[in-house]
């Protein structure tokens, strides 16, 4: 068996007839499959045992030799070799074709490769191959030309005129003869000569032909091999035939297709032997050609061959294509053993790193481990009896199981796995029942809830796998979200509500103003009912033993509440005592204003002070982030568990519920509505008098009602009691928001109709009052649209993620430092005046490219190639610096990846990124995962510019696919001044820009809004009208940096509008992949062809070589490819073929004789190697774990 880890690369090419025969174990001569009586394979048929090997292990066809001892014997009676039946998966056969047949991929693909080699049009080829015309293969001394097509009539006429002095024939044989006559070197030289003078379409055609001919020349493939003399037959186990229960047979479509080929081939042989008339033979040859076409790619030409029920048969090409094809179904994703799935329920008492595994599931999953342990403990004599014990569920089995699963992590996965936190490792604890218990805090990462979600369990078997699960995938390790480095395990819902309730303050609560000597005394008073959780009390600060208190503070009284005392117990000792939800308190220390001198009238002080707001969800997130920053992982996960317990405990104690009585309708609502109605009437009057247009009237009415709703919302929120349960739920961030509440108690507001246009009659009722029938009907439109949108969005977002992963899958951190001399100048990303991403957010976790000094004092804030931490970023902001040179993925020189310095911090760990980290995939997941949260809608801005601005998911796709945007802006191609703006007859604007050298006139389309005025200076690439810039045009007019900046800013804009934060570096990784190719314009003296796409690094190599040899280097222009196109242009044909357009990619690769160097992740998954990222990188592979534990697979195989 071939060891996957031994080979370096994989090569694909065309197979010569000799090669096909050398693969084969014998010729398939009959179309029979298996004998209907004996159910054994027919001799020389499609399942023949003599060719493909025995159907039963170690047994020949006739039964003369049985058992292993005859291994390798070839039976003298039936000719079958005695061996394993597994060989029927690998042994091939062949069919000797009676006439050559063209391979449809090379003749029919676009562009037709055969057509390019022969310089014939695909139409002409088709006529020859399918016996409609003759082609002259050798004109002899006649005036005919080689490759000239002749109809039947012309052929006869020329035959009579010239006799045998010329040769013409039809079918694939003629094409084969022409292909054999081609002298590649001569042809290439002639074309290169012609290329020097050619222009226009002729030039493009020559370049295309040169590309194919060069490919044949350099790969050593013979063009004549595009025509088949021998057809390989794939192993029978790969096109099985199985008996169904009713005695009928189910068979793979390939067998039908092979049968047709064999039948027609045998008929053709017979006709040739009989010397049948030419016309009959030709017809049979054409049918054979069509049968082979159908076998290779059914439906590519003409109507597909159909099976029973008019279903097109699946040919060899279809076996590879699409989601159900070999690549995506079986190679990139396989079903695995040692796995199970079940419904999840909440496990509130679990630790962060634990999950509850149902007993029977655990027993099944860990069966081999349990069996081994039973034998070792002497509880069973051998594996067989151990197995029997487990099947009968002996009581002692459970004790053994308990011990086996200790310290053995399992992986839990919830589909859809949108990012790497969709699979995490936990230590299992056995639970009764049949449901998996999940820790409530990891739900956010999985996006799980307990309304019937299911999860899958996988058991890592080997010692290495267990070590990786424990060290890298344990849930307690994955606290930060890879997309923005913020904690992903923030408490939600009940937990938030409990902690909010716990930290509330209330005026005049029982026991207000009491002073306690320490926490225990305060808790005692609380448990005995002398003081309430919300009572503001004082406590001796020294008794808290908090390390952040100063000596002076320790001698004072701390003003706080009982609830806050309880809350602060969960925090580490050296953490500030949190008394108010402010950044200063969380990141710095407890503010002085809460410390009172001893002997002060505490009650008096309390009365003077405002109430401190309770801790909301955001604050809890801040606390977690700060604890993580100071104390790292173990401490954080312990604190999270304690926070969770507090939350559940106090939300239960609070007993917060909602009833209809909690929804208080606003008394002055009617006044507000009447006022708005009066305004609307005024607008209508103006419209009737013709003072305003219909469109303006519509706009105004809508803004009046929106303002009315906002006013109601405002009043509602102000008039609400702070202890109203609904208010508490929404204010704490547990569930619901202000707008939900307005709909319950205020008014529902404006609704959209099915077309997405807002209906100008608002819904004036709230849910509390009840809607009228019409109001109810109107509001159903929006509800339905919402559901339909969500369904569409999920599919779209998933496909976007797939394309992103594909284009960036080979971006891995490959080295420490690439030594680049470039960086990028980071400023705050702005859109007009609005800041999209603040400068400090862009700086944190990056390396400085140049030393940054304080502008006034000149002292060094951060040196070159030093990491910018949060503190340094704050210093930079305080110094008032607005732009900083940083190292960036954009400027990284590493091949096939990035280096540590250019990437900076790994967002998921908060540390430097490790060599081997698959940052490309992390980037793709970080951009794709929030995709579902982006809206689908294209907003109607209304008004004069009735132009749609694409936003949300479609805008992200438009940017990454580098499409021409909707509502494209006109941009200036030169630096200069706007000298005039004129309106033309058909309402278009003409903008004239005068530069130093030339003057350009730009016509802005009808109803575009201008962004410039006369006399204004404009730069190249500046927008003259509002709208989105076409990045390809920007690249042509300006430089690569402005395109990178533009794409980064635009993508960030879409996500930030939806409140999703993504680190810049993820978008940078993607944009870099889109810009990694150049198109050659002038080849100079190099071997590259003009118009070809090359990798930037390849191009530099080619030029470096040319310069060394004193030749003229090539010139090229940077191109921007959309992610789909970039994926298909990758160097790896395995990766491209498994993505899209499988047949085109493979055809192309085969002709070029491409080598796949197996650098990316996909290629290695496909061939079954360890991925070359993380611990699978060559540099780590030599490291062997010291533990020698027998793995489960050893145990199983020893049965």
Swiss-Prot record:
Instruction: Provide the binding site for Zn(2+) 2.
Output: 818, 892, 899, 902
Q: Spell out the InterPro entries in the cross-references.
A: DNA-dir_RpoC_beta_prime, DNA-dir_RpoC_beta_prime_bact, RNA_pol_asu, RNA_pol_N, RNA_pol_Rpb1_1, RNA_pol_Rpb1_3, RNA_pol_Rpb1_3_sf, RNA_pol_Rpb1_4
Highest taxon, organism lineage: Bacteria
Cofactor(s) essential for the protein:
Mg(2+); Zn(2+)
Q: Does the keyword Magnesium apply?
A: yes
GO MF term list: DNA binding; DNA-directed RNA polymerase activity; magnesium ion binding; zinc ion binding
The family note in this entry says: Belongs to the RNA polymerase beta' chain family.
Report what the protein is called.
DNA-directed RNA polymerase subunit beta'
Q: What is the originating organism of this protein?
A: Geobacillus kaustophilus (strain HTA426)
Q: What is the lineage of its organism?
A: Bacteria, Bacillati, Bacillota, Bacilli, Bacillales
């Amino acid at each position: 068996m071939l060891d996957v880890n031994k080979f370096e690369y994989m090569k694909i090419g065309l197979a010569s007839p000799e090669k096909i025969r050398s693969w084969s174990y014998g010729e398939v001569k009959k179309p029979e499959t298996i004998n209907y009586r004996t159910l054994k394979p027919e001799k020389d048929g499609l399942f023949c045992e003599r060719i493909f090997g025995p159907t039963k292990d170690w047994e020949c066809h006739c039964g003369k030799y049985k058992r292993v001892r005859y291994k390798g014997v070839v039976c003298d009676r039936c000719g079958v070799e005695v061996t394993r039946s597994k060989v029927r998966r690998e042994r091939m056969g062949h069919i000797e074709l009676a006439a050559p047949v063209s391979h449809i991929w090379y003749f029919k693909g676009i562009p037709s490769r055969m057509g390019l080699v022969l310089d014939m049009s695909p139409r002409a080829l088709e006529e020859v191959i399918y016996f409609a015309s003759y082609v002259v293969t050798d004109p002899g001394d006649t005036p005919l030309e080689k490759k000239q097509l002749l109809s039947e009539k012309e052929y006869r006429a020329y035959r009579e005129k010239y006799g045998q002095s010329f040769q013409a024939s039809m079918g694939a044989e003629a094409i084969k003869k022409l292909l054999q006559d081609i002298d590649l070197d001569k042809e290439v030289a002639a074309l290169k000569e012609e290329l020097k003078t050619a222009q226009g379409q002729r030039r493009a055609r020559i370049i295309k032909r040169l590309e194919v001919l060069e490919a044949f020349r350099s790969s050593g493939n013979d063009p004549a091999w595009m025509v088949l003399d021998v057809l390989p037959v794939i192993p029978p186990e790969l096109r099985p035939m199985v008996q169904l229960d009713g005695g009928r047979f189910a068979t793979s479509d390939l067998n039908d297709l092979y049968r047709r080929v064999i039948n027609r081939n045998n008929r053709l042989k017979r006709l040739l032997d009989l010397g049948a008339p030419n016309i009959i033979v030709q017809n049979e040859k054409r049918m054979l050609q069509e049968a082979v076409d159908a076998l290779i790619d059914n439906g590519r030409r003409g109507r597909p061959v159909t099976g029973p029920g008019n279903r097109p048969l699946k040919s060899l090409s279809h076996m590879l294509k699409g989601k159900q094809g070999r690549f995506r179904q079986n190679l990139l994703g396989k079903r695995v053993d040692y796995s199970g799935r079940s419904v999840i329920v909440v496990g509130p008492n679990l630790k962060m790193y634990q999950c509850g595994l149902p007993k029977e599931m655990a027993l099944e999953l860990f069966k081999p481990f349990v069996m081994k342990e039973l034998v070792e403990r002497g509880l069973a004599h051998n594996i067989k009896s151990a197995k029997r014990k487990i099947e009968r569920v002996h009581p002692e089995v459970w004790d053994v199981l308990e011990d086996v699963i200790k310290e053995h992590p399992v992986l839990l996965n919830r589909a859809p796995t949108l990012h790497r936190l969709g699979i995490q490792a936990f230590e299992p604890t056995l639970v009764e029942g049949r449901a998996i218990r999940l820790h409530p805090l990891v739900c956010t990462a999985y996006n799980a809830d307990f309304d019937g979600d299911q999860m899958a369990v996988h058991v890592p078997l080997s010692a290495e796998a267990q070590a990786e699960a424990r060290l890298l995938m344990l849930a307690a390790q994955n606290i930060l979200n890879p997309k923005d480095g913020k904690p992903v395990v923030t408490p939600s819902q009940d937990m938030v509500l409990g902690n909010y309730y716990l930290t509330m303050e209330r005026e005049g609560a029982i026991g207000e103003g009491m002073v306690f000597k320490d926490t225990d005394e305060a808790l005692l008073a609380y448990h005995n009912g002398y003081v309430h959780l919300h009572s503001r009390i004082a406590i001796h600060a020294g008794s808290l033993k908090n390390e952040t208190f100063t000596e002076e503070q320790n001698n004072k009284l701390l003003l706080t509440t009982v609830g806050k005392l309880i809350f602060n117990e969960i925090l580490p000792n050296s953490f500030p005592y949190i008394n108010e939800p402010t950044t200063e308190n969380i990141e710095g220390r407890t503010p002085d204003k809460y410390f009172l001198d001893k002997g002060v009238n505490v009650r008096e002080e309390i009365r003077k002070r405002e109430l401190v707001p309770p801790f909301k969800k955001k604050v809890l997130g801040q606390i977690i982030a700060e604890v993580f920053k100071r104390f790292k992982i173990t401490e954080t996960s312990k604190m999270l568990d304690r926070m969770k317990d507090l939350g559940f405990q106090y939300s239960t104690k609070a007993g917060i519920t909602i009833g209809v009585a909690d929804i208080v309708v606003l008394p002055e609502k009617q006044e507000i509505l009447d006022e708005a109605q009066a305004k609307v009437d005024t607008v209508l009057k103006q419209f009737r008098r013709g003072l305003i247009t219909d469109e303006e009237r519509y706009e105004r009415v809508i803004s009046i009602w929106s303002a009315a709703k906002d006013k109601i919302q405002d009043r509602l929120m102000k008039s609400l009691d702070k202890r109203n349960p609904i208010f508490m739920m929404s204010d704490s961030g547990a569930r619901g928001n202000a707008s939900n509440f307005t709909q319950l108690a205020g008014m529902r507001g404006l609704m959209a109709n099915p077309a997405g246009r807002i209906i100008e009659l608002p819904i004036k009722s709230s849910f509390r009052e009840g809607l009228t029938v019409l109001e109810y009907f109107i509001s159903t439109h929006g509800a339905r649209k919402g559901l339909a949108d969500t369904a569409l969005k999920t599919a779209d977002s998933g496909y976007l993620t797939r394309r992103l992963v594909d284009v960036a899958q080979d971006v891995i951190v490959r080295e420490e430092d690439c030594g680049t001399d470039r960086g990028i100048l980071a400023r705050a990303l702005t859109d007009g005046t609005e800041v999209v991403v603040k400068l400090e957010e862009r700086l944190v976790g990056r390396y400085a490219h140049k030393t940054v000094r304080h502008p006034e004092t000149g002292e060094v804030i951060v040196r070159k190639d030093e990491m910018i931490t949060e503190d340094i970023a704050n210093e930079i902001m305080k110094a008032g610096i607005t732009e900083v040179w940083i190292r960036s993925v954009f400027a990284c020189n590493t091949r096939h990846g990035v280096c540590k310095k250019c990437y900076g911090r790994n967002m998921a760990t908060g540390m430097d990124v490790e060599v081997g980290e698959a940052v490309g995939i992390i980037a793709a997941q970080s951009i794709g995962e929030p995709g579902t949260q982006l809206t689908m809608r294209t907003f109607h801005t209304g008004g004069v510019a009735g132009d749609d601005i694409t936003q949300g998911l479609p805008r992200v796709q438009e940017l990454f696919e580098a499409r021409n945007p909707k509502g494209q802006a006109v941009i200036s191609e030169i630096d200069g001044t706007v000298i005039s703006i004129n309106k033309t007859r058909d309402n278009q604007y003409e903008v004239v820009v005068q530069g130093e050298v030339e003057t350009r006139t730009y016509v802005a389309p009808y109803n575009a809004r201008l962004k410039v005025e006369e006399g204004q200076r404009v730069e190249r690439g500046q927008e003259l009208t509002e709208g989105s810039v076409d990045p390809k045009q920007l690249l042509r007019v300006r430089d690569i940096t402005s395109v990178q900046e533009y794409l980064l800013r635009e993508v960030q804009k879409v996500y930030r509008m939806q409140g999703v934060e993504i680190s810049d570096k993820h978008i940078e990784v993607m944009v870099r992949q889109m810009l990694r190719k150049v198109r050659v314009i002038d080849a100079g003296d190099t071997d590259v062809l003009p118009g070809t796409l090359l990798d930037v690094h390849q191009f530099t190599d080619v030029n470096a070589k040319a310069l060394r040899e004193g030749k003229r280097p090539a010139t090229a222009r940077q191109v921007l490819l959309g992610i789909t196109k970039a994926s298909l242009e990758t160097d790896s044909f395995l990766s491209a073929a498994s993505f899209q357009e499988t047949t085109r990619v493979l055809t192309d690769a085969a002709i070029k004789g491409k080598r796949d160097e197996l650098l990316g992740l996909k290629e290695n998954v496909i061939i079954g190697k360890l991925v070359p990222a993380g611990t699978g990188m060559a540099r780590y592979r030599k490291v062997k774990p010291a533990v020698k534990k027998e793995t489960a697979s050893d145990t199983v195989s020893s049965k």
